[in-house]
Amino acid sequence: MRIILLGAPGAGKGTQAKIIEDKYNIAHISTGDMIRETIKSDSEIGKELKKVLDAGQLVSDEFIIKIVKDRISKDDCKNGFLLDGVPRTIIQAEELDKLGVNIDYIVEVDVKDNLLIERITGRRVHPASGRTYHTKFNPPKVEGKDDITGEDLITRTDDNEDTVRERLSVYHAQTSKLIDFYRNFSSTNTKTPKYIKIDGDQAVDKVSQDIFNQLK
């Protein structure tokens, strides 16, 4: 099973991706995680990527395809995989097709923008462990402190409202074209991904069940 998981920043893609990965025993390929690891390395390319993300822009198609191509060649992807964060553009989708990557399902987790903004701007992170909290939905026991270590929590630099609105604008502009691309795929290809739109405003387990009901 090969799945593309779509959803705006803050839609809960990461949570659903982990649940899908465990249920179907497929590899979860998160470009976001791979990009963050590159930034942590403090290399020159990592510094450039940080500037791009801080400005609310998307990483180049060339870089994304390069890291995805390398990742899907690994043995753990032979049983299938879930792409989280790619493709985001028509160019990326076309490049995946050129690589012979046949997709079975396109799953979009749809959440209203006002809720996404609330989710993201209230997010707080413990840098060392990656533990994530939320000022409203999942607050720490002590405000601004990690529950386990007591260390300070931070707000990611790209989690401010202006940057979030810019990211959402870019996401919507590109995703609508991407969905049209895959819908039109049927005119020239016998194997067409099934497009599934899921209401992401629901509880996590309800979102998961709705996805499972469609992945048959």
From Swiss-Prot:
Q: Where is this region: NMP?
A: 30-59
- Where is this protein primarily located? cytoplasm
Q: Which reaction does it catalyse?
A: AMP + ATP = 2 ADP
Q: Which GO terms describe its cellular component?
A: cytoplasm
Q: Could you tell me which InterPro entries the record lists for this protein?
A: Adenyl_kin_sub, Adenylat/UMP-CMP_kin, Adenylate_kinase_lid-dom, P-loop_NTPase
Q: Write out the pathway annotation from the protein's UniProt entry.
A: Purine metabolism; AMP biosynthesis via salvage pathway; AMP from ADP: step 1/1
- What SUPFAM superfamilies does the record point to? P-loop containing nucleoside triphosphate hydrolases
Cell compartments where the protein resides: Cytoplasm
This protein's assembly is summarised as:
Monomer.
What this chain does, per the entry, is described as: Catalyzes the reversible transfer of the terminal phosphate group between ATP and AMP. Plays an important role in cellular energy homeostasis and in adenine nucleotide metabolism.
Q: What's the family?
A: Belongs to the adenylate kinase family.
UniProt protein name? Adenylate kinase
Species assigned in the record: Francisella philomiragia subsp. philomiragia (strain ATCC 25017 / CCUG 19701 / FSC 153 / O#319-036)
Which gene specifies this protein's sequence?
adk
